[in-house]
Amino acid sequence: MKPVFCGNFEYDAREGDLERLFRKYGKVERVDMKAGFAFVYMEDERDAEDAIRALDRFEFGRKGRRLRVEWTKSERGGDKRSGGGSRRSSSSMRPSKTLFVINFDADNTRTRDLEKHFEPYGKIVNVRIRRNFAFIQYEAQEDATRALDASNNSKLMDKVISVEYAVKDDDARGNGHSPERRRDRSPERRRRSPSPYKRERGSPDYGRGASPVAAYRKERTSPDYGRRRSPSPYKKSRRGSPEYGRDRRGNDSPRRRERVASPTKYSRSPNNKRERMSPNHSPFKKESPRNGVGEVESPIERRERSRSSPENGQVESPGSIGRRDSDGGYDGAESPMQKSRSPRSPPADE
């Protein structure tokens, strides 16, 4: 009977799951479970052909892996016509004190069941069950060899078990490895190893090479960028420079300068209050500094009055202020303008 190879399923897959999967296409005699793959023995080869055609590339398990199902290249142990196939493959490996046991009932088999099955061949030091396989460690290597020859392809709880040497002897910490795990590092295992892209992502060189987004963030948090965000000297001079305030006062209109510079703005006299409340109050008439008596003429009013004067803008000088005589003249000294206008010829005799 030629077994069917089934691979690429999950490591925690159970023998019963594979058996139920292949049972849809014919009677399954047994399933020889390994680490990550298995050999399925079917009673009729035509049923095995149907299973290969239907299940190859079939999604199986929780992760939906695609199974690899095909004929094996050589017959394995358990073949009734050549029952020593598995024994020959085990004897070709380096003998050790630890045996690798598979294809038992992982749901119901306990450590005590394995001890009972292997105790007749020598003193057992340690028994460990890992999911669907187990390790049996003997005290002497000769006892392990005797147990291998006697128990391979034997029945344990109605299951035909497969026994081989472990790749590495168990030590005090129990670090035995299955022989199929070492074979599993062949091309089938390498295909499942991390891709070069992932290795590149985890390498120190990739960590030093920043992405464009990281470079942008680095630029934003750099000290140079922080200094550019600090207040500029220009803004400081605008906020705290007294020259800037004087420039603003210089740019104001003459009316605003008159209002700001006039001491009557802060006057609290009743006359000032009444004048401000008066509807006839002009913003250009300011009180004189003589206790609010009289009005000070603004430059604009003076200019308007000079334009409307019959003397064409010729006004009296401050030095000519005095009492007017009865004929409209002045009692004081004449201004230079009046002297220029006075007739230079002597008065005519009457």
Swiss-Prot record:
Reported phenotype of the disruption mutant: Mutant seedlings show increased sensitivity to salt stress and abscisic acid (ABA).
PROSITE patterns in alphabetical order: RRM
Location in or out of the cell: Nucleus; Nucleus speckle
Tissue: Highly expressed in roots and flowers. A presumably longer alternatively spliced form is found in leaves, stems and flowers.
Chain ranges passing through the membrane: none
Gene Ontology molecular function terms on file: RNA binding
Annotated segments matching region Disordered: 73-94, 167-350
Main location: nucleus
Name recorded for this polypeptide: Serine/arginine-rich splicing factor RS40
